[in-house]
Regions:
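Conserved active-site-adjacent core of cysteine acyl-enzyme catalytic domains
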Residues: 43-157
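Active-site-adjacent structural segments surrounding the nucleophilic cysteine of cysteine proteases
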Residues: 1-69
Length: 157
């Protein structure tokens, strides 16, 4: 797989735009990693005009913004479906700190088959809270990813 289209939630074109659930005030730059990761998938495989701005607007209009957090997991499947793409949830519980989880093998198999994987990362190497990233290649112990909050391409461990 070649590198997918890359978007940053902190891009000045949309970073300061509203991405707030009822009762909060936040922005795409602070909380829009999920729709930004999905925008990368959609712009790569379906419609190059899709941006984090358009995906955050769609997620907000359908109630997928979680108050005081980011985006509900349930957003991704319908977001893909409206462009004729299939999305599958591999896991819905935490596997934080579980190096031998079967979900790691499922994600690796998906990458080996040329699929993109949106992963929700817990506190650790890449984030201090929850954060969605787009995995697009695995080479040895190096994961190549598009992180909506970073320009760094490859991570190990």
């Amino acid at each position: 797989m070649t590198q997918p289209i890359r978007y940053l939630q902190t891009d000045p074109r949309w970073a300061k735009l509203d991405y707030s659930a009822k009762g909060e005030k936040t922005t795409i730059g602070a909380s829009g990693c999920g729709p930004t990761a999905m925008a990368m998938v959609l712009a790569t495989w379906a419609d190059k005009s899709v941006t984090p701005k358009s995906e955050c607007a769609w997620a907000l209009s359908r109630g997928y913004k979680a108050p005081k957090q980011g985006t509900y997991y349930g957003y991704f499947t319908p977001a893909a479906k409206r462009y004729g793409l299939k999305a599958y949830m591999l896991n819905s519980t935490t596997i934080y700190g579980k190096q031998d989880s079967p979900y790691h093998a499922k994600a690796k198999a998906a990458l080996d088959q040329g699929h993109l994987v949106i992963a929700c990362m817990g506190p650790g190497l890449w984030t201090s809270s929850g954060h969605f990233v787009l995995l697009w290649k695995l080479q040895g112990n190096t994961v190549f990813l598009n992180d909506p909050a970073s320009t760094r391409l490859a991570r190990t461990q």
